[in-house]
Amino acid sequence: MAMVKRNNNTGLIPVSTKQLMALGAAAGASALQGFVRNNGAAIVGKVVDVGQKVYKAVKKRGGKKQQQIKHVGGTGGAIMAPVAVTRQLTGSKPKFTGKTSGSVTVTHREYLSQVNMSTGFQVNGGIVGNLLQLNPLNGTLFSWLPAIASNFDQYSFNSVLLHYVPLCATTEVGRVAMYFDKDSEDPEPADRVELANYSVLAETAPWAERALWVPTDRIKRFCDDSSTLDHKLIDLGQLGVATYGGAGTNAVGDIFISYSVTLYFPQPTNTLLSTRRLDLAGTPVTASGPGYILLTRTPTVLTMTFRATGTFVISGAYRCLTSTVLGLTGGVNVNSITVVDNVGTSSSFFINCTVSNLPSVITFTTTGITSATIQCNRATRQNDVSLI
């Protein structure tokens, strides 16, 4: 049955539920306005009184003597180890811009290397010899940029960022440090005392990511064509990654480098092929192209020590007297290989391999080793060197 009300003529007029609720709300609002108008001062006083009581209660709870939850303290910048931490990585699209004829600005991010923890103090995976000199043609620092920079004479870095991204658990112990040295020919720091004296330095626990901004001056310098005797004249400086205090040598993170560099004055393409030669006495006589590999030998062992990570094709030959035995050390994995032994005279080889971290070494063991020649270049696994 519909709800009704009477009018002045005592007639019945139907009223819906919605209309009745609207009438009730209007009446309630009118009554509330009247109450507030007549008792406004009392209401305000009550609100203020309640607010003061709440403030005193909160202040009392925050007192040092009654604080129930305490955290391990630290100086400014300290962080607490979470249960888990990760970083989601996305691809980087290189950007090319140019405002001046004969120049181009390249902005990109590249993968540098995997970081393995160490118990003692170690820099750049234990590889010495100014590994990460800041020059666009340095193939040990950049894997993508040299193919472009090899077509230009000069460069100027606009910005450089070194970024450590962890991949280990938060229970991992040790430290990871990144530094910048303005002199690209300074020796690597020998211990933590020397490391701490760098003005551009960033350290972190292996489970926490960290970034190092490198100061740039936008001065035009020459790209490295491997014929410069004093590298500090052509390099912006050098980078380094140090580890220490770990419980083992497991992988703890990755290093990425982001940069913006302007290349000037196009030139004929410079070589991207690394060539290293030893004479009959084992003395280096040729070193051209990127420094992917350090070549040394004894009368019984030919050693190729990698100075960069990635996939490479290595070809070479060396004088020896007997058949050779291949040896692999560190993070190097052979994808394909061909070895030809000319017993009594020499041996030659072709190797396609992937290097994930440093130090990584390939050796050939035999007898009567004298001179040697090797060539190395970046490649893919599809560059199969197996003899069919």
UniProtKB/Swiss-Prot annotation:
User: Which residue windows are coiled coil?
Assistant: none
Locate the region S domain, virion shell.
Answer: 103-263
Q: Where is this region: R domain, interaction with RNA?
A: 1-102
Q: What is its main location?
A: virion
Organism's domain of life?
Answer: Viruses
Q: Where is this region: Involved in encapsidation?
A: 56-61
In terms of InterPro entries, this protein maps to: Capsid_prot_S-dom_vir (IPR000937), Coat_P (IPR055068), Viral_coat (IPR029053)
Q: Which GO terms describe its cellular component?
A: T=3 icosahedral viral capsid
Q: Which residues form the signal peptide?
A: none
Sample GO molecular function, one term: structural molecule activity
**Which SUPFAM superfamilies does the protein's record reference?**
Positive stranded ssRNA viruses
What are the alphabetically sorted keywords of the record?
A: Capsid protein, RNA-binding, T=3 icosahedral capsid protein, Virion
Gene3D superfamilies for this protein: 2.60.120.20
Cellular localisation: Virion
Region annotation P domain, projecting: where it falls in the sequence: 264-388
Q: How does it assemble?
A: Homomultimer.
Family, similarity comment: Belongs to the icosahedral plant coat protein family.
Q: State the protein's purpose.
A: Capsid protein self-assembles to form an icosahedral capsid with a T=3 symmetry, about 32-35 nm in diameter, and consisting of 180 capsid proteins.
Protein name as catalogued:
Capsid protein
Q: Which organism is it from?
A: Artichoke mottled crinkle virus (AMCV)
